């Protein structure tokens, strides 16, 4: 039977997520019973025909329980994958209905056909809507087929897994798999026993620390194990490169006449030094006097194999697992862990306090290779000084930001909590964020504000997968960056995008002056807390 538009309009992953929880609880009970059966068999000391028969029965029971545990484990992961797919479909349906809201002369019939009401819209708009509907239905068919295939394999006995209770994470992958969605990662982690989790954090922190969908406390613990190891390795690499650099430099310096060549190890030395600076700064920020700062969570620690790429990190001020409001700050050009994270965390501290520290966490997210900026020729920057002129970096960065946000949402959803997630992006960071929000899963991000934006890709707020009316922007009067990217594919400055609301700005302020403006900080805090930023609490307090 064909899947239709009228059916997928009502698709929602909530029932599948509930099924994952039910299956997880069943797996844990089955594993307890399997352990008890194995223990009972091991306790038998007698012999004889009756005892032999009993042991045979216990052995058969063990095999049966092992098989059931393996099958339930497969159902957990299959259902989590399907939940991700249904969420994709729900998002695509949202994009279709948002398109209709943007072009109200168009409508979608129960049969999925595009209808025209009122004045005749452009042909390109009708074609675009038809394509969106087609993609939504195609994704629904794909999800249904994939899930049915995995379910039939279990039902028909074609699914085979011979793991026993003696195996690590019986019936489940021992390590997270490449390509998992945050929903799948969360389901896998939720199905593991506490002993299995502790073993993974201890023995494989590199597989856990950056896994979107896991609790922040887990990621923080794993990354804090990794950080000193990565720093030590970076220092050793720098020492080795420095020795090679010095050796060649002695030869160059010894040339008595003629032009002296450039040291061939210069770039490698500078890159290795930047790597050490990144990790040293991060270690300083998340620790104090050799002790961990427990109100900071190290949620991302990505150390590229090659040193020509900067370390990526995300640090939360506050506990994202307990916070009902989680804001993510996305910086613009020139920001690296070594040069930008410290200032971002200072701002995050203030934003959290203004929004209500008891229920708020603020993340400083440097999860992409921010362009170094125009004319940056100093020796402390990776990347090209022309990267900021195109959207290529933003296109590459957007999926990582989406996964990060989705992971926070999913980890809260596992606790039965719908968090209020917001994005606060500056300069090129708004281009990254705007690109991400074009494709983010529906329901994840509740509001976003862009300040000092060269352009955030959309021409109408309906194009971002954020509730309409919850997109904001601030533009200082002497900011020369605002709107400068429109001709380069960045899109118009957000203040010119229908559906975007303006918040406080400074008519005399420059590009990077926003957070020092108390009124802007107040508006950002209200957005973070899910309040209306048009209500000026500073002025109201002054009038009391």
Regions inferred by a protein language model and the residue ranges of each:
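N-terminal secretion-targeting helices of virulence/extracellular proteins
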Residues: 1-167, 396, 410
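Lipolytic serine-hydrolase domain surface
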Residues: 319-321, 332-419, 437-544
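Short, glycine/acidic-rich beta->alpha junctions
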Residues: 60, 71, 309, 343, ...
């Amino acid at each position: 039977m064909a899947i239709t538009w009228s059916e997928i309009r009502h698709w929602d992953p909530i029932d599948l997520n509930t099924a994952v929880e039910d299956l997880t609880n069943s797996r844990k009970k089955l594993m307890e019973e399997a352990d008890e059966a194995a223990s009972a068999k091991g306790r038998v000391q007698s012999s004889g025909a009756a005892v032999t028969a009993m042991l045979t029965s216990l052995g058969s029971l063990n095999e049966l329980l092992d098989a059931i545990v393996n099958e339930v484990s497969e159902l957990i992961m299959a259902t989590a994958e399907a939940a991700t797919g249904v969420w994709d479909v729900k998002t695509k349906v949202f994009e279709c209905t948002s398109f209709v809201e943007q072009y109200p002369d168009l409508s979608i019939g129960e049969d999925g056909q595009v209808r025209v009401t009122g004045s005749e819209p452009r042909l390109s708009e009708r074609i675009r809507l038809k394509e969106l509907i087609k993609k939504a239905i195609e994704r629904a068919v794909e999800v249904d087929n994939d899930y049915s295939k995995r379910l039939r394999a279990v039902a028909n006995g074609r699914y085979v897994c011979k793991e026993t209770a003696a195996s690590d994470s019986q019936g489940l992958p021992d390590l997270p798999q490449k390509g998992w969605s945050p929903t799948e990662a969360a389901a896998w982690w939720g199905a593991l026993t506490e002993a299995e989790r502790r073993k993974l954090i201890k023995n494989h922190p590199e597989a856990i620390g950056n896994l979107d969908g896991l609790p922040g406390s887990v990621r923080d613990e794993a990354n804090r194990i990794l950080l000193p190891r990565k720093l030590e390795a970076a220092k050793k690499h720098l020492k080795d490169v420095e020795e090679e650099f010095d050796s060649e430099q002695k030869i160059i310096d010894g040339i008595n006449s003629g032009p002296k060549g450039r040291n061939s190890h210069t770039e490698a030395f500078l890159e290795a030094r930047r790597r050490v600076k990144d990790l040293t700064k991060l270690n300083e920020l998340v620790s104090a006097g050799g002790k961990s700062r427990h109100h900071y969570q190290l949620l991302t620690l990505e150390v590229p194999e090659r040193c020509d790429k900067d370390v990526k990190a995300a640090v939360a001020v506050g506990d994202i697992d307990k916070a009902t409001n989680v804001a993510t700050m996305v910086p613009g050009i020139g920001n690296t862990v070594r040069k930008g994270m410290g200032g971002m965390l200072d701002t995050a501290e203030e934003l959290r306090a203004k929004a209500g520290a008891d229920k708020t966490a603020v993340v400083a997210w440097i999860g992409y290779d921010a362009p170094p900026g125009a004319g940056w020729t100093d020796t402390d920057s990776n990347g090209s000084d022309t990267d900021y002129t195109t959207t290529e970096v933003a296109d590459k960065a957007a999926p990582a930001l989406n996964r990060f946000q989705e992971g926070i949402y999913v980890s809260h959803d596992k606790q039965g909590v719908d968090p209020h997630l917001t994005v606060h992006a500056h300069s090129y960071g708004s281009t990254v964020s705007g690109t991400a929000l074009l494709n983010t899963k529906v329901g994840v991000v509740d509001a976003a504000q862009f300040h000092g934006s060269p352009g955030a890709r959309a021409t109408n707020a309906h194009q971002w997968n954020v509730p309409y009316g919850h997109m904001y922007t601030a533009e200082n009067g002497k900011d020369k960056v605002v709107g400068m990217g429109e001709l380069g594919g960045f899109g118009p400055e957000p203040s010119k995008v229908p559906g975007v609301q303006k918040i406080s700005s400074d008519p005399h302020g420059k590009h990077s002056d926003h957070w020092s403006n108390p009124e802007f900080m107040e508006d950002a805090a209200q957005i973070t807390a899910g309040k209306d930023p048009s209500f000026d609490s500073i002025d109201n307090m002054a009038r009391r």
